[in-house]
Structures are given as structure tokens and as C-alpha cells.
Amino acid sequence: MDPYELVTRNTVEVVTDEELRALIDRPVRRVYTGYEPSGEIHLGHMVTVNKLMDLQQAGFEVTVLIADLHAFLNRKGTMEEIRETAEYNRRCFEGLGLRGANYVLGSDVQLTPEYELAVLELSQAITLNRAKRSMDEVGRQMDNPTVSQMVYPIMQMVDIATLGVDAAVGGIDQRKIHMLAREHLPSIGYPAPVCIHTPIINGLDGKKMSSSAGNVISVADSEEDIKKKMKKAFCPPEVENNPVLEILRYHVFPRAGAVAIRRPEKFGGDREFAAYEDLERAYAAGEIHPLDLKNAAAAHLIDILAPVHDYVCSR
């Protein structure tokens, strides 16, 4: 797979395609994603982790910002608690295969005079309404936001400038913040970043993924947990908004390269699929039972997540 195909597979959009193609031709190219420290790293996080691994393979230098100050502004705990979680998150990302990346703790770069001045400069240009809309898009609808929450998206923009990256990766819910960065960073002397957006996948029940809703698979889940959760997963006959197919498309195929459906001969015997599109067609045609699809997804996820358990526990 050529670098462009690697970078763009399983993405929703690239802003802009022309800029990305030009960037790929450069000898040095840098990309980043920021993660607010989370006590539970799950399949939602893994979508962008997978994309960063694609970018590494395509020759990009990858920076991962563990945004401890962002988490503090978003009331996720004390700084001590958040930093402990941040270290756990870093180990999880490395266990998932994202090694050789430059891991940066937000507070190590976000408390300098230069950073703060850039935040203040951008705050003069961005209205409260636009800042609030960008936060609403990432799932933080706020009827009565604090000033700190309005600073959040501006800091995210300055992160791009401070880290010296050429491109930013995020879920499609980050689009409004990224578009603000493209619009305003040139006004303070920084280039507009290429923006690579990945899909937001559904929770196991077909609804919005949320740790609090219990509809996620975490990297810390045991084999039994994964099997139980997959067995209960929503798996309609349709391919649209099917969380089991999404797991296979965005997690299993990029890592395993192929998927095996194991079943007794009386139910059609084993089948191998080298491409997601072939599996989707077979499922849509009724050639694969939902339970067989769930079992295949569970087996592959167990294989994918096993190294995470080993890596995190060994440190």
C-alpha cells in the first residue's frame, strides 16, 4: 500500500487532499493527535491510534500529546490524579503498537510565556459563540460554560503550532476546532495544518460510545469480558451503523489483514476474507450469521489486545 493510501484509508475526510499529497512528498513530515487522559482506553481511542500507526508506516514523525491541562480544565480531577492517568494512557498506547512516537505531556509545553501569549492572541480573534460551537461538536454541550472551557479549543489550536507539526489527526468531531486552527494560525505566524479526520464509531449497543454507558470494549478487558460484551453486541442484518462490522473494519482488518469466520461444516464451514468489503457483502447477503460475526470479532480483538495487557503489566 502506498503512503497516500495508508494515510487516507478508513478516514472520513482530509482537509485538504491537495495539501496532503504535497506533504507526503516532503522528506520530513510531522503529525500529531492529542488525547485527554482517560481512565479507560477503549476502541474509540484505538481508531486514531490505528491511524497514527498508518502515518508512521507512511514515513511521518508522530507526536502524541497527553493533554493533562486540558483534562484539568475539563474538571477530570486533580493534576496529580490526571498525570497518573496520563502515564497509564501512554503505556496503553505503546502496548497497542504506537511505539517510536514522541509522547509529550501537555503541561510540559503549555505553561511557557510564548504559549500563553499565542493563546491570548487567538482569544482576541475568536468569538465565544465559535469557541462554544467547537466544544459542542466534541460532545461537550454546555448551557453555562466556564471561561476555562472556552479556552480549551484555543489551547488545542496553539498545541498544533507549538509542537511544530504539519498535520493533525482527530475524530470527525474535532473538525470545527481544526477548521478554527486552519483559519487563525496563519494570523500569528504559523502554517495551517493538514487535517485528517477519522470516523466516530458506535458503542456495542449501536448508540454513542461512552465508558459510563458500559457500551465499550476497553484495552483492560479480559478475554471473558470481551466475549461476553461481543455476544450481547447489537448486530442487525444491515451493514449501516452495525458496531460489530465497524470493529472488524476499523480495528481488525488494519491490524490482522484478513478475517477468518470459524463455524461447523453443517453451517457452511470456515470462510476467509482478505478484504473488509468482501466480508461486508457476504454479511449483507445473509451468508454469515450475526453470532458467527460476533465470535470472529471477539477472537481477533482478544489477539489484538493481549499484547497491551502484557506490556502494561510488565512496566
Swiss-Prot record:
Binding site residues for ATP: S211
Keywords: Aminoacyl-tRNA synthetase, ATP-binding, Cytoplasm, Ligase, Nucleotide-binding, Protein biosynthesis
Superkingdom per UniProt: Archaea
E.C. designation(s): 6.1.1.1
Enzyme superclass (EC): ligase
Coiled-coil stretches: none
Functional description taken from the UniProt entry: Catalyzes the attachment of tyrosine to tRNA(Tyr) in a two-step reaction: tyrosine is first activated by ATP to form Tyr-AMP and then transferred to the acceptor end of tRNA(Tyr).
Motif ('HIGH' region): 37-45
Keyword GTP-binding among record annotations: no
Single GO BP term: tyrosyl-tRNA aminoacylation
Similarity remark: Belongs to the class-I aminoacyl-tRNA synthetase family. TyrS type 3 subfamily.
Motif 'KMSKS' region mapped to chain: 208-212
MF annotations from Gene Ontology: ATP binding; tyrosine-tRNA ligase activity
Reaction catalysis annotation: tRNA(Tyr) + L-tyrosine + ATP = L-tyrosyl-tRNA(Tyr) + AMP + diphosphate + H(+)
Protein name: Tyrosine--tRNA ligase
Keyword Nucleotide-binding: yes
UniProt cross-references to SUPFAM superfamilies, sorted A to Z: Nucleotidylyl transferase
InterPro entries assigned to the protein according to its UniProt record, in alphabetical order: aa-tRNA-synth_I_CS, aa-tRNA-synth_Ic, Rossmann-like_a/b/a_fold, Tyr-tRNA-ligase, Tyr-tRNA-ligase_3, Tyr-tRNA-ligase_arc/euk-type, Tyr-tRNA_synthase
Source species: Methanoculleus marisnigri (strain ATCC 35101 / DSM 1498 / JR1)
Subcellular location as annotated: Cytoplasm
